[in-house]
Curated annotation (Swiss-Prot):
Belongs to the orthopoxvirus OPG058 family. Induction: Expressed in the early phase of the viral replicative cycle. One of its GO terms (cellular component) is host cell nucleolus. It comes from Vaccinia virus (strain L-IVP) (VACV). This is Protein OPG061.
Amino acid sequence: MKVVIVTSVASLLDASIQFQKTAYRHHCNYLSMQVVKEIEEFGTINEKNLEFDTWTDVIQNDEIDALVFYRVKQIGISTGVLYKSMMRNRTKPISMYFVRDCLAFDGDPPSFRMTSCNINAYNRNKIKDLIILMNMKTCNKKIIGEFIIDNFGSVDALLSIINSNVTWVTSVINNSNGRGINIRVSNNKMLTITSFRRFVNKLKMYKTTKCASQLDNVCTEMNKMDIIDKK
């Protein structure tokens, strides 16, 4: 399957272009998709975008099987409306995939469906190890923060994996006793979204910790420097 990936940033809260591309690559490799082109946009995507040459070249090329987006909210209009606009210049149906949401928009008539999200054996084991570390009172924030960076690259990358595999991650949290991460599990061990949210919020704290650590390192290096006052 030949696909075109579409990145876009509409606000400071959106994932960076580079982060989106990394997520796309993993998703496309998992679904055996061949990336043949990349489109970068700023702001939400609507029918006006389709008027540009970059888009018309893609839409009119029936060898392109699908467009891959990061999230549904990248599209500023109805997904169905965007699909119909593209199909005016195509003879072959085109699919749309949304990596972050684990959704695809295709079929006849086209509609949303869930897609498989990749969480390989390595990531499964490392997430389990992370939960164990967070349950240990002897592990401080520095140790856990370094574990995240060493095994996932960044907190954002870890959160992307976790948010794409809510059911599995919540089941692992549910099977743990919750000590050290303040997660209460009901007696019948029901999987609750509250447990998942608490876990995610705990992880987000390590983004701040990392920034503070980097600032401390910069300040330490500055203290070592000899400042010469040139007159």
